[in-house]
Amino acid sequence: MRTWIAILAVVLVLLLNACTDGPEDGPRLEHPDETGVLRVVTRNSATTYYLDRHERAVGPEVALVEAFADHRGWTVDWTVAATTAEVLDYLEAGAAHLAAAGLTHLDSRNQRFERGPAHTEITQQVVCHRDRTDKPRSPEDLEEVVLKVTAASSYVERLEVLAERYDALTFQEDQRGSEQLLMAVEEGRLACTVADSNIVRLNRRYLPHLDVTMDLTEGQNLGWYLAEGQERLAQQAFEWMNSRAGDEVIAAMENRYYTYVGEFDFVDLRALKRRMESRLPRYQRHFEQAEAETDMPADLLAALAYQESHWDPQARSPTGVRGMMMLTGRTAESLGVNDRLDPEQSIMGGARYLADRHERLPEHIPEPDRTFLALASYNVGRGHLLDARQLARDLGRDPDDWQEMREVLPLLSDERYYPNLRYGYARGYEPVHFVARIRNYRDVIRQAFE
């Protein structure tokens, strides 16, 4: 009797597992030409798909897929998987037409799926802090450096191969993802790490002390994979990606997400002081008027505007934001800004937006923490800040204390945490640096408003 009960229990567990979320085998998907819908599986990361501060899906893969679908007259139905393995499971089960998840084209994958077009060439790169004097420039030099790399990654496989040739080469596997390890290098907490070149390029925009010392591999292709039986769709994808229109979209994607900005002079005190003399006087009264309406301090607004545009009313970025406060068209419209290039309107719009972020935070949060959290929300989006505050509670940290939150926010890009967050992946180190720079600027700018 107990044997039959055990068998029934196993069957019940299997049935329950079959009902859980995840890919399910089923009829092959109809072609998007017939349904008008392209079903795509991806994963959360800065190089694939994430929600921006306005909770819009953005990312390199999003830009390419949406352009391809728009060219064909289709809409896109996105599924976000937790891991690369889960992405491939969805595709193998026929739950998606296409996987666009920063996938390296590999022989093993080519045997399982219909290979789609490649869009990005990468290499694995060794990255160290730029002030380090003994940077490794060759495999032999790696014997003198203890590397930390993401556990169970392609980096581990490559280093294991090299370790067979160089006996003194050592490395440690770490549960943190590439972005977390790059941040540790930036902050001087880690000597060197290894990451894909596209991840490095993207993060150097915000982590200016990273230095690529050598390539560990030759070029590898990132691209799409399609479900078995989707040969016609694969051909359409190849034709579009290799067309002039496809080339233009790839170039725009490269410019938006990967162009290296570097430090330039956003940390240059001399440049700031020059602009305080040459530019700030033209706009100071607008900051003061915005303070009168919103109660946001004029010197804080001036520091925010300097961070956003260096007080350039004609500023624009590849992402489509424009003006002194670098507002999107939709945000500007919601704030009553008719002309984003009008500095008075732009400053008032940015002040209203920051005031809204401030007012939406609990009143019990003391200053200056409430203002710092409002700035973080301004930068990364309210949804992602709410995720970070909940994560802080889960970790036993204080969500009202900025010193605590500046350590929690970067975890929004940690794959140990973001799959379980409502708004998913975010480059959580960005708001930390954003707030720090504004605080530094404000300390200098304050004298002009006293």
Swiss-Prot record:
PROSITE patterns: TRANSGLYCOSYLASE
Database matches in CDD domains: MLTF-like (cd13403), PBP2_YfhD_N (cd01009)
InterPro entries: Lysozyme-like_dom_sf, MltF, Solute-binding_3/MltF_N, Transglyc_AS, Transglycosylase_SLT_dom_1
Gene3D superfamilies the UniProt entry points to: 1.10.530.10, Periplasmic binding protein-like II
Annotated region described as LT domain, given as residue ranges: 262-450
Disulfide topology: none
Catalysed reaction, written as an equation: Exolytic cleavage of the (1->4)-beta-glycosidic linkage between N-acetylmuramic acid (MurNAc) and N-acetylglucosamine (GlcNAc) residues in peptidoglycan, from either the reducing or the non-reducing ends of the peptidoglycan chains, with concomitant formation of a 1,6-anhydrobond in the MurNAc residue
Record's signal peptide: 1-20
GO CC, alphabetical: cell outer membrane
GO molecular function annotations of the record: peptidoglycan lytic transglycosylase activity
Keyword Lyase (UniProt): yes
Task of the protein: Murein-degrading enzyme that degrades murein glycan strands and insoluble, high-molecular weight murein sacculi, with the concomitant formation of a 1,6-anhydromuramoyl product. Lytic transglycosylases (LTs) play an integral role in the metabolism of the peptidoglycan (PG) sacculus. Their lytic action creates space within the PG sacculus to allow for its expansion as well as for the insertion of various structures such as secretion systems and flagella.
HAMAP family cross-referenced by the UniProt entry: MltF
Family assignment from sequence similarity: In the N-terminal section; belongs to the bacterial solute-binding protein 3 family.
PANTHER family cross-referenced by the UniProt entry: MEMBRANE-BOUND LYTIC MUREIN TRANSGLYCOSYLASE F
Domain text: The N-terminal domain does not have lytic activity and probably modulates enzymatic activity. The C-terminal domain is the catalytic active domain.
Name of the featured protein: Membrane-bound lytic murein transglycosylase F 2
